[in-house]
């Protein structure tokens, strides 16, 4: 065998994750690649895997024939198309992402949506290189589609009006990526693909732009990922579990991606379970039938062995407690099992160990989602008391209730069930449960609630403070001189509340406001500009007061300190001035008063 052939064989198929918001075109893109005219000619050229589609290099070359200029060693591309969030959060392996590359599909006309945000945050967590497919260019006003044509060729045939519409949408999309910390540009304007995210305008429906999209993926894999694609063909099989599900007639099975080595029927494998490492023997390895028959569900082809990279279904005993998102490995000895157990334990600790004494309780469906959510919560500065995989039980509620801060008495549940009695327990202990199937939405709703609660508490604190106020006694409205003195006043600045003490400009205490009446009705509070009658205790007009003075609300020292430190900017100018005058009165004898 020539050296060149050996090299080609030594590189495994790169794994490409296809991510994006629902209805933005993930399935349409893969369907288009599967059903392109080329594929029809090369009967059976594309292999359908469990949760994945393998596109060999020959097919990619045919699709890209008009623009193919590169010498390539990789055998093709394996696209992972597991539905829903699982495609995001389970695509993990030790030391990062299971996917070597990703396509982030965004509807160019709609821009970013919650699942787009989620996909980006996971790509960031796992440091996965990605390309943005700006889909649905066929819906841009004025755009004339040319089926299966490279984007640049189609773009050259468009009217200026359509080109401008495309550029405007691209500009918005690139700006959205930039706001999230990614430098991006249209693919043909990039010189260094390691520093800038390539944006490829495509129509998954019409096939436009798909040649460039595939070419860029192949180029990125070939140029920047070659080291990661070295394959130990004879080595032990290693992979990641995408989903654990029951199949009629087979029992509980694992859908998995084999990313290294070879897996054979009869191999002994170790997989991370919910409470312990599960060691079992592979009874069967299943793959779907060829593409042309793939719509026939429930029919699988049994194979004796499989080499990476591949999407497979593993049939084996004792898979009930396997964790989706966890790794599996072929083990040949007790020592192998011990090493695997130690690695799993360390990995789980690395993900969940950095917990805080005070913080929220986090429960997720997989290790991948746990890792992604911890990362997102840390970025938001939210403390985490406990982070685990599994359904929410009463113990989680009790743990959350033990927090001192009410804002941390929270359970965040991502794509897991609330076990019976949990909601009643939460009501009993005053614990809030947030549950959602989209990471971005779960965190957004929690952060929004937390901020609203924090502001409500601040408002309550502010409400409880005695605020600054300045009043003028109206001499022509002295209704009673003593026991209590009743006099008309005008509020000059700030506010006047029932029960506050009053002082003179020289600091002499006057007495407390017992009651307040405005237009014959009792009131508890009056604001600047109001005129009303007030009853003042322990004072006689004509002795302690003349009846035409300006008086200040005697703000307690503790309250004055908070107002000066935290609330000064929220006061209007008149109130601010009155408060400063009040502080000067107090600090005449004691310069450190209220500091």
UniProtKB/Swiss-Prot annotation:
Residues 45-49 are annotated as: G2. Keywords: GTP-binding, Initiation factor, Nucleotide-binding, Protein biosynthesis. Belongs to the TRAFAC class translation factor GTPase superfamily. Classic translation factor GTPase family. IF-2 subfamily. HAMAP family: IF_2_A. Residues 20-27 are annotated as: G1. Residues 203-205 are annotated as: G5. Residues 135-138 are annotated as: G4. CDD domains: aeIF5B_II, IF2_aeIF5B_IV, IF2_eIF5B. Function in general translation initiation by promoting the binding of the formylmethionine-tRNA to ribosomes. Seems to function along with eIF-2. The keyword Lyase does not apply. Residues 11-225 form the tr-type G domain. Residues 81-84 are annotated as: G3. This is Probable translation initiation factor IF-2. GO terms for cellular component: cytoplasm. Gene3D superfamilies: P-loop containing nucleotide triphosphate hydrolases, Translation factors, Translation initiation factor IF- 2, domain 3. One of its GO terms (molecular function) is translation initiation factor activity. Pfam families: GTP_EFTU, GTP_EFTU_D4, IF-2. GTP binds at residues 20-27, 81-85, 135-138. It comes from Archaeoglobus fulgidus (strain ATCC 49558 / DSM 4304 / JCM 9628 / NBRC 100126 / VC-16). InterPro entries: EFTU-type, P-loop_NTPase, Small_GTP-bd, T_Tr_GTP-bd_dom, TF_aIF-2_arc, TIF_IF2, TIF_IF2_dom3, TIF_IF2_dom3_sf. The gene is infB.
